[in-house]
């Protein structure tokens, strides 16, 4: 699986076990992603951050 890093079109190949791509947003400004990459489990939302995940190449 290949996931975008913080700024597309830069991407990286995910390590084994982290087979989801994610975008992380601050809940207060949920329009601009603050982080992108590979993640093992989703969703992982909290009071401050929201994760949007997917399982196909470069879909974040």
Swiss-Prot record:
Tissue specificity remark: Expressed by the venom gland.
Localization (cell): Secreted; Target cell membrane
Gene Ontology annotations of biological process type: killing of cells of another organism
Molecular function terms from GO: toxin activity
CDD domains: TFP_snake_toxin
Superkingdom: Eukaryota
Gene Ontology CC terms, in alphabetical order: extracellular region; membrane; other organism cell membrane
UniProt main location, coarse: secreted
Other notes: Shows very weak hemolytic activity.
Family according to the record: Belongs to the three-finger toxin family. Short-chain subfamily. Type IA cytotoxin sub-subfamily.
Function in brief: Shows cytolytic activity on many different cells by forming pore in lipid membranes. In vivo, increases heart rate or kills the animal by cardiac arrest. In addition, it binds to heparin with high affinity, interacts with Kv channel-interacting protein 1 (KCNIP1) in a calcium-independent manner, and binds to integrin alpha-V/beta-3 (ITGAV/ITGB3) with moderate affinity.
Subunit comment: Monomer in solution; Homodimer and oligomer in the presence of negatively charged lipids forming a pore with a size ranging between 20 and 30 Angstroms.
Protein name per its UniProtKB record: Cytotoxin 1
């Amino acid at each position: 699986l290949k996931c975008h890093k913080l700024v597309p079109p830069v991407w990286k190949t995910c390590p084994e076990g982290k087979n989801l791509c994610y975008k992380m947003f601050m809940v207060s400004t949920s329009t601009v992603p603050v982080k992108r990459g590979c993640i093992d489990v989703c969703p992982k939302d909290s009071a401050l951050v929201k994760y949007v995940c997917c399982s196909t190449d470069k879909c974040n």
